[in-house]
């Protein structure tokens, strides 16, 4: 698909259609027709037009980004998370089996005495709500997050619980704790930040001698293969070559690592931790229409993945521009947008009869100080 960028370039250079027509020796009506797609310029004119604007022909045709300047992902910023409470609520609903967390606490980490827990990047405190009732009585939970809205939400969720909890509004990177903790933990944090290894080392500093550091992270490759929808082609759902380029671009440009889950055990060793190991979260969501909680879980899966509505042409072009800026070529970006819209359409048309399997592929890595 060609996305002719003439109008965008003309407006960026503060030119009227009349002025651009005079430069190119055509009428303003011709410029208007080119911009609205009624007609197209002769191929021989493309080098002249692109040279005038100082861009490549591929960029003029929308086959390459107009700007070389990389636009960083904002997922490691407080602003990004201020209004994503609903997203966290929906994703956490299908993230854990309670009995597996109980197995980790009692049989793997062998926690038998009351402990203090620091949850780094706690969000609304989902991990504490799951874990704290499984810990010995007298344990304390401390959650820290750089989103004020998330901290306020956490306080509301814990207000009427029996959990001894405290919440701190602060950036982990600049946090200076008054004490160290028996257990320092994070969930789905390191994949979102720049330089996750550095943040992990920072977390290790918060751990008491003899204490435990735990990181729970999705490996994005696992996650990209972790969805099957009956009636859709599984191989098509797994196709993500363009995403691999995006992951590589973000790693090169801002040191955001979508594969960090695989590397964390080795980062823990470099940070001086001992008896390091890793496990896989055993949660796999299998959804069938007959399930009593079918609508609830389907709704959460749809909203967690932003599959509520098909994207408009304008939204698709905005997304394509972003994806191309992050390493995809235009075809890969178009294919990915088409894939997402295809999922939305299928789920909407078959809402009453969806069968699916979904897993995040979360790796749980841990080591003692």
Question: Which ranges hold each PLM region?
Answer:
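A short, Lys/Arg-rich alpha-helix, primarily the initiator
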Residues: 1-12
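A short glycine-rich, Lys/Arg-flanked "PGG" loop and its adjoining helix->strand segment in the class I
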Residues: 198-212
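DNA major-groove recognition helix of helix-turn-helix/homeodomain DNA-binding modules
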Residues: 44-59
């Amino acid at each position: 698909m060609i996305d002719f960028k003439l109008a965008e370039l003309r407006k960026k250079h503060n030119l009227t259609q009349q002025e651009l027509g005079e430069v190119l020796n055509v009428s303003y009506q011709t410029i208007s027709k080119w911009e609205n797609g009624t007609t197209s310029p002769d191929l021989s004119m493309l080098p002249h037009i692109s040279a005038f604007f100082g861009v490549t022909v591929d960029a003029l045709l929308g086959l390459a980004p107009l700007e070389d300047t990389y636009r960083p992902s904002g997922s490691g910023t407080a602003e990004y998370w201020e209004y994503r409470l609903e997203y966290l609520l929906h994703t956490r609903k299908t993230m854990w089996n309670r009995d597996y967390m109980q197995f980790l606490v009692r049989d793997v980490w062998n926690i038998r005495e009351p402990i203090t827990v620091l949850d780094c990047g706690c969000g609304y405190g989902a991990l504490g709500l799951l874990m704290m009732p499984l810990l010995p009585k007298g344990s304390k939970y401390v959650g820290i997050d750089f989103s004020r809205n998330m901290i306020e939400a956490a306080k509301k969720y814990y207000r009427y619980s029996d959990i001894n909890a405290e919440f701190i509004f602060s950036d982990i990177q600049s946090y200076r704790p008054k004490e160290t903790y028996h257990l320092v933990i994070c969930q789905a944090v390191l994949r979102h930040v720049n330089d996750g290894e550095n943040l992990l080392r920072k977390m290790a500093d918060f751990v008491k001698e003899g204490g435990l550091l735990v990181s729970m992270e999705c490996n994005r490759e696992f996650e990209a293969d972790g969805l099957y929808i009956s009636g859709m082609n599984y191989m098509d759902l797994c196709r993500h070559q363009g995403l691999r380029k995006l992951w590589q671009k973000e790693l090169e440009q801002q040191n955001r690592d979508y594969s960090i889950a695989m590397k964390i055990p080795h980062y823990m060793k470099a940070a001086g931790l001992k008896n390091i190991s890793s496990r896989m979260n055993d949660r796999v969501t299998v959804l069938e229409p007959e399930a009593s909680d079918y609508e609830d879980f389907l709704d959460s899966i749809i909203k967690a993945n932003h599959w509520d509505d098909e994207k408009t042409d304008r939204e698709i072009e905005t997304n394509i521009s972003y994806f191309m800026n992050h390493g995809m070529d235009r075809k890969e970006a178009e294919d990915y947008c088409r894939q997402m819209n295809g999922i939305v359409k299928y789920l909407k048309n078959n809402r009453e009869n969806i069968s699916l399997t979904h897993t995040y592929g979360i790796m749980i890595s841990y080591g003692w100080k």
